[in-house]
């Protein structure tokens, strides 16, 4: 099926208070989305797809599918957060009966400098959210923001293993947020039960 393209930006974050306390469930933080963005563009492709980011080289890394799984044509993979977001979003899409397709995904960022040095504005969280949101548009999944947050949080935790996901919330919802994290142990138990 023909897919439309998607192009969107999500903001980075800045913790105002509670950056360390919020790692524990029930402890709040105040977070603000900043006017620095990550942009993800997705364009339909035919035989294989690609992922490209100026932070890791201007050359795209090609990918294909094997047994329904996305497989990169590259030994060193700098796109862990993007791939985790793709895998979980596409799993959601398949559960909704959506046929998967190939596409070229391009990332540009204002959250790192030109040398790839991070400013601490939540670039890994922002690229995870931007990927989920772009695929939501590309596949026309009609996810609400809470579903986008949940998928992005699970993808981020799959790569990082810990963290409050406050950066995910800021990139997902924007503006000023009072945020408390969820019980990661409960989520881990549920994931183990369902797999």
Which residue stretches match the model-derived regions?
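Short, small-residue-biased leader/transition segments that mark boundaries at the very start
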Residues: 1-5
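Alpha/beta catalytic cores of group-transfer enzymes, especially the acyltransferase/condensing modules
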Residues: 143-192
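Charged, glycine/proline-rich intrinsically disordered loops and linkers
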Residues: 64-69, 187-195
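Active-site signature of alpha/beta-hydrolase-fold catalytic machinery across serine-
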Residues: 130
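ATP-binding N-lobe of GHMP and related small-molecule kinases
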Residues: 6-121, 133-143, 174
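Short, conserved phosphate/pyrophosphate- and ester-handling motifs at nucleotide-, phospho-/glycolipid
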Residues: 124
